[in-house]
Amino acid sequence: MRIAIAGCGQLARMLALAGWEMGHHFSFIADPGEGTDCVDGLGPVVARDRYPEPAALFEALGRPDVVTVEKEHVSIALLQGLAEHSLVAPSPEAIRICQHRGREKTALQNLGISTAPFQLVEDGPSLITAVKALGYPAFAKSCEQGYDGQNQWLLRDPESLEALAAQMDSLPPLIVEGAVHFDRELSMIAARSVSGETALYPLAENRHREGILLTSEVPAANISEETQAQANHIARTLLEQWSYVGVLSIELFDEGGKLRVNELAPRVHNSGHWSQDAGVTSQFSN
């Protein structure tokens, strides 16, 4: 099978190395200015800006059977164009939802999946109104592009709120989330095939430092049958309702056994790296 990956980072490398063992061949789509050291030598690297037309890009990539992603921040128009020539998995629509925290949380709530309370804001007055409704502490995050603690603000008191409100004219739209008093952070790696077969990996307990994942303990300790059933239901609901194809990473808050979804990633995830050595099948092989 010929597989094209949008992105040239470490996750693309791990995907390609896993796929090589299965006889697959890879090519990579590089954004302008994107480094390619991680994937050099693993297959053709095609600069996206050299092929603005999807048909030409498809040919330059070697006419792949499947196009996938190693990151969610990919041009949706590009993926939609490639979808006219190849299977794009996950779907452009699933990736579009996961690119924007507001769309993501709205989609989750529409499926009856619990999240932190939230409001979307675009200016200083709407930010102040949102925090008054949600209470302190609150967390403001960019709707797009924020990850690993970047473009995020902890609002503890009126002073920190006023300071951020004064900056809103120079900031993109934000999502403001009310505090969730969780006991721990969990995550699950889930996968679904084109034929609808699903696989769920064990829950991991994750510890972060300054917003960056430090350790994952797998399987997470002291998971009750009820908690596991909740996690399985969340994962299966998303996979089935979205007709999802590929790997979906689900970050969760555990509040005394009640689970809320924090964020989704429509791709392989660093909390699933353990599966390379400790899993019968790694996340990258799916």
Where are these regions (language model features)?
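A short, polar/charged loop-to-alpha-helix boundary motif
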Residues: 211-213, 271-277
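Active-site nucleotide/adenylate-binding loops and adjacent lid/helix of ATP-dependent enzymes
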Residues: 97-187, 191-241
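Anionic group-transfer/hydrolysis microenvironments
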Residues: 32, 72, 143, 179, ...
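Short alpha-helix boundary/capping segments
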Residues: 223, 275-280
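ATP-binding N-terminal substructure of ATP-dependent carboxylate-amine bond-forming enzymes
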Residues: 1-99, 103, 110, 125
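Conserved metal-phosphate-binding beta-hairpin within the catalytic cores
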Residues: 243-273
